[in-house]
């Protein structure tokens, strides 16, 4: 199985969530289950069933994060030297050929993608069109809404 690329920031975010789940959320739910058990009959105890359900979600998320981290190839973007080419982790300034509007995207792993923060998945149509290109190149992005042309204004590794 191939490793999944992940930036250092993305890995740190997952590690922080994992730490919170293990040190805060898990003990809180265990205490809630113990308290609900003291209320007697478990068959008709809604608090108990809700706490057990929440425990299942927390344990599932812990396993999911641990699996992601164990299968991750953590890439420090600041140490990249790709010679100006667009690669995973690069921050790319683009100019829309039609409107002249400029946008900035960082190419990140699937789990880190957040368009509001300007982070796009390495598997997105825009990122796939950009990978391997350089400053000054014009790329055509094939998107569901039609083709769009962008000029690569700058490539940074920050």
Swiss-Prot record:
Iron as UniProt keyword: no
Keyword Coiled coil in annotation: yes
Source organism superkingdom: Bacteria
MF term (GO), any: DNA binding
Family annotation (InterPro entries): GreA/GreB_C_sf, TF_GreA/GreB_CS, Tscrpt_elong_fac_GreA, Tscrpt_elong_fac_GreA/B, Tscrpt_elong_fac_GreA/B_C, Tscrpt_elong_fac_GreA/B_fam, Tscrpt_elong_fac_GreA/B_N, Tscrpt_elong_fac_GreA/B_N_sf
Disulfide pattern: none
Pfam family for this entry, one: GreA_GreB
Coiled coil, from the record: 53-73
Keywords: Coiled coil, DNA-binding, Transcription, Transcription regulation
GO biological process, one term: regulation of DNA-templated transcription elongation
Family named by the database record: Belongs to the GreA/GreB family.
Role summary: Necessary for efficient RNA polymerase transcription elongation past template-encoded arresting sites. The arresting sites in DNA have the property of trapping a certain fraction of elongating RNA polymerases that pass through, resulting in locked ternary complexes. Cleavage of the nascent transcript by cleavage factors such as GreA or GreB allows the resumption of elongation from the new 3'terminus. GreA releases sequences of 2 to 3 nucleotides.
Name of the protein in its database record: Transcription elongation factor GreA
Gene source species: Thioalkalivibrio sulfidiphilus (strain HL-EbGR7)
Lineage: Bacteria, Pseudomonadati, Pseudomonadota, Gammaproteobacteria, Chromatiales
């Amino acid at each position: 199985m191939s490793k999944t690329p992940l930036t250092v920031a993305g890995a740190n975010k997952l590690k922080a969530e994992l730490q919170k789940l293990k040190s805060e959320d898990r003990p809180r739910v265990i205490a809630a289950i113990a308290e609900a058990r003291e209320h007697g009959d478990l068959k008709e105890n809604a608090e108990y069933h809700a706490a057990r359900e929440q425990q299942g979600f927390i344990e599932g998320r812990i396993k999911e994060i641990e699996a992601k981290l164990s299968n991750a190839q953590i890439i420090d973007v600041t140490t990249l030297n790709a010679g100006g080419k667009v690669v995973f982790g690069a921050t790319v300034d683009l100019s829309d050929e039609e409107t002249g509007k400029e946008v900035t995207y960082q190419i990140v792993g699937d789990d880190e993608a957040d368009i509001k923060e300007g982070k796009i998945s390495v598997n997105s149509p825009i990122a796939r069109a950009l990978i391997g290109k350089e400053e000054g190149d014009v790329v055509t992005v094939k998107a569901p809404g039609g083709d769009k042309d962008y000029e690569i204004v700058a490539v940074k590794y920050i």
